[in-house]
Structure formats: C-alpha cells, structure tokens
C-alpha cells in the first residue's frame, strides 16, 4: 500500500476529483444513486426493458456474491484511498458512503454489478453489451466518489467473471 503503484493510483484519484465530470451534477447524481441502489438499477432495467421481473434472482445473486466478496475483502485487507491519503499526504475528498466500511479490494460494486451483468446478459444476449456498459459505469463511479483505486475495480470485475463462471453458480442459476 506504500508502493509507487499505490501512489500513482492516488494521483489518478486526485486527478479524477478535479475532472470536469466530477463537477457535472447529472453524472455525480447518477453515481451517488449507484452507491445506494445499484441493484435497483438492474431490477428496473429488467422490468422496463427486458420485460421480466428478476428482483428475486438479483437479490439472491447479490446475497450469494456478498459472501464470496466479503471473504476476499477480509483476506486482502486493502485500505480505502481515504485511509491512505493522510499517509501519502494526498488531498483526497471522498464521498462519505455507508457502503465503504469494508476493505477496498476488490470493489463490491464492481464485483456485484459485473456478476449481475454476466448473469442477465447470458439469459438475454441481446442486452449483454448494455448491461456490461452499465456495470462499467457503476464500477467507475467508485473512482469518482473517491472510494476505490482502479485496481480494486479491476479485481472486482475479474472475480465476478470467475464467480459467475464457476460450477456452483452455473448449477444454482442454470447458466
């Protein structure tokens, strides 16, 4: 966590916090909504666009994924950017999120949103690209909110693909 890579990632976060997107109220409003309700975004999309109520399966995938995710987070114990900022003398001003009380690595929002995108996209391939774009947007919101480093997001996506590709997931969810 004191490596040059971490310092580079901190500089990237500070740059993002000074970007024009950070000052765009529409973008930041969307990102703040994702912080609290990203599962609801998938539920609404499924109902309104796909025409299927997938609330129960989305809740179950999120619940099951949280167990896997928590094991990974507490294994790696990576501090959040705001926890390292003072030691790196970085001027980082993260959003105060109730969802940011666990270790940073991997990003839970990345993990769960990509897991949902992969699952729903496997059931409805014509929606796969939109769903993965949505998962990406949810994932990068964590950078703009100052809650994760880029590598947290990358590993969240990687772990989600492994999770959804597992025999246990395929058996339980029929993919």
Functional labels for PLM-detected ranges:
Residues 1-148, 158:
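Hydrophobic alpha-helical bundle signature of multipass membrane enzymes
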